[in-house]
Amino acid sequence: MKRILIILCAALMTASCAAAGYAPRTDYMAEMLEAVCAGDYAAGSAAAEKRAEKIARMALDYPQVEFEELWLLSKIIYAEAGSVWLPMEWKMAVGEVVLNRMASPEFPGTMREVLEQPGQYYGKNNPYFDGLKPSIECAEAARRLLEGERVLRAPSVVFQSNYRLGSAVFLELKDALLGSTYLCVSSHPELYAA
């Protein structure tokens, strides 16, 4: 009798998952990362929807990650710090500045708006940026950031440039080939006081 109940429960769970449109053992985040690297927005969006449904139906304690943000953050990390020899910390620091800007009262509140702001990053409808296919390392850095991991842990760091900006340099990253990248604090640090 116990064996029949186990088989029946397994069959019901499988049928429930199949009706739901997701597979319980599929790693949809891995599919999202693959889609980012392949430049396949439709596949990534579909995987994100299935992942969100799986998290909700199975009551999993996973952070929600929007595919649009994973897509854009992976691309900007690749554009700004995609060189294969640059360490993961550098890639994540670049991405964290974008997230800090999204949370800042000084900048727009969405990733797309932050990246498309005039004079910042690559702007709107940029063929170079639009055509980028990030490396898996850049996509992984974006995933880690969107899931809450931080390397700077300083919300007031809202500038990343080849020269000093803002009120202070928080961190200078140096590379023999690329030179220095400065991660700088806002000109209005009082906005970030806890």
Q: Which residues does each PLM region occupy?
A:
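Bacterial extracytoplasmic/cell-wall-associated proteins, especially those involved in peptidoglycan
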Residues: 37, 44-194
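Gram-positive cell-envelope targeting signals
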Residues: 1-47, 55-60, 80
